[in-house]
C-alpha cells in the first residue's frame, strides 16, 4: 500500500491521505449480493450494545473464497480491488477450469501472478496447503480452525501468523495478537502476509469520510451527564468520581479481562495474547 498526501488546497485535504495503488473496477455480478445492515450497533430491542456505529454508505458484499476449494488448479490474478467490508484488499482469480473467485490479496502479489491450492504445492506466496506440508517458520494467513470450514484467523490487513512447531496431530502457531495456540495439522492456510499493510497509517482527513464508513463520533464519558455514563456529571472539568474507570453500564473497564472462563479452546491456548 502506497500512501500519498493530498495537496493542501482545503482544510479537509490538508491532512488527508490516499492510496495510490487502489484500483477502481466493477465487481463481478455473480460474486456479489446485497445485504441489509440492520441494527448498526443495536440489539433486537433497539438498545445500543456496540457504540460508535451507524449510518454509512450502502455496501455490496463480495463473496470471498476462504476455503480455497479449487484443488491443484492454477489460477491467475486478474484484478486487485477495494472491498468496503474489510480493511484488506481482494483480488479476482481466474482458474484454469473457468471458475472466477475472490480471495484476500497477499502482500506483494501483482496482477498476472499464478496461485494454486492443494496438498503438494510449492511454498509460494498466495498458495494454500495444509499445515502438515509446510516447513517450520512459514509465514501464513487465512488459517482454518475447523477442517473444511474455511480460514478464520489472520484475515485483517497486514495480519500474519507463524508456524513454530508440529507435534502429533497438532501444529503450534503464533498469531498476530501474540497468542500461541494449537491447531490441527490437517487444517489449511495460505502462505504469506495479508496485503494493504499501511492501512493503519491512512488519515481520512475529515469527519465526513469517517461517517461514510459507518463510524460515528466517539464521546468521552466524563463530558456526559450522570444519566448517560458513570463518569458523567460534576461542576466543570470534574474527575470520574470513582477509583477505577467503568463502562457505560457500570462494569470495570480499561484492563479487565473479558474472556469467558470456560471455553472449549482453553486447552488449545498455550499462551494468552499480549496487549
Swiss-Prot record:
Residue ranges, compositional bias (Polar residues): 7-26
SMART domains: Ribosomal_L2, Ribosomal_L2_C
Region feature (Disordered): 1-26, 224-275
Superkingdom of the source species: Eukaryota
Molecular function per GO: rRNA binding; structural constituent of ribosome; transferase activity
Chief location bin: plastid
Pfam family, one: Ribosomal_L2
Biological process, per Gene Ontology: mitochondrial translation
Keywords: Chloroplast, Plastid, Ribonucleoprotein, Ribosomal protein
Subcellular location: Plastid, Chloroplast
Family (UniProt): Belongs to the universal ribosomal protein uL2 family.
HAMAP family: Ribosomal_uL2_B (MF_01320_B)
Protein name: Large ribosomal subunit protein uL2cz/uL2cy
Species of origin: Phaseolus angularis (Azuki bean)
Amino acid at each position: 500500500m502506497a500512501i500519498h498526501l493530498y495537496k493542501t488546497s482545503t482544510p479537509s485535504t490538508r491532512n488527508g491521505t490516499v492510496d495510490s495503488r487502489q484500483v477502481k473496477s466493477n465487481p463481478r455480478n455473480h460474486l456479489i449480493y446485497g445485504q441489509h445492515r440492520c441494527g448498526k450497533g443495536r440489539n433486537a430491542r433497539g438498545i445500543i450494545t456496540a457504540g460508535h456505529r451507524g449510518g454509512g454508505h450502502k455496501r455490496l458484499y463480495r463473496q470471498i473464497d476462504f476455503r480455497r476449494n479449487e484443488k491443484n488448479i492454477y489460477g491467475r490474478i486478474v484484478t486487485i480491488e477495494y472491498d468496503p467490508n474489510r480493511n484488506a484488499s481482494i483480488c479476482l482469480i481466474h482458474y484454469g477450469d473457468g471458475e472466477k473467485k475472490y480471495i484476500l490479496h497477499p502482500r506483494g502479489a501483482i496482477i498476472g501472478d499464478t496461485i494454486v491450492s492443494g496438498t503438494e504445492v510449492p511454498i509460494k506466496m498466495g498458495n494454500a496447503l495444509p499445515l502438515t506440508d509446510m516447513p517450520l517458520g512459514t509465514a501464513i494467513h487465512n488459517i482454518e480452525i475447523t477442517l473444511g470450514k474455511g480460514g478464520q484467523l489472520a484475515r485483517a490487513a497486514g495480519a500474519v501468523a507463524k508456524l513454530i512447531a508440529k507435534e502429533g496431530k497438532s501444529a503450534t502457531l503464533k498469531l498476530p495478537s501474540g497468542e500461541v495456540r494449537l491447531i490441527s495439522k490437517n487444517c489449511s492456510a495460505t502462505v504469506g502476509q495479508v496485503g494493504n499493510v499501511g492501512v493503519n497509517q491512512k488519515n481520512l482527513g475529515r469527519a465526513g469520510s469517517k461517517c461514510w464508513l459507518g463510524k460515528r463520533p466517539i464521546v468521552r464519558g466524563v463530558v456526559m451527564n450522570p444519566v448517560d455514563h458513570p463518569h458523567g456529571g460534576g461542576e466543570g472539568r470534574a474527575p470520574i468520581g470513582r477509583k477505577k474507570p467503568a463502562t457505560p453500564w457500570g462494569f470495570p473497564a480499561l484492563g479487565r479481562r473479558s474472556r469467558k472462563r470456560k471455553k472449549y479452546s482453553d486447552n488449545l491456548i498455550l499462551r494468552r495474547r499480549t496487549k
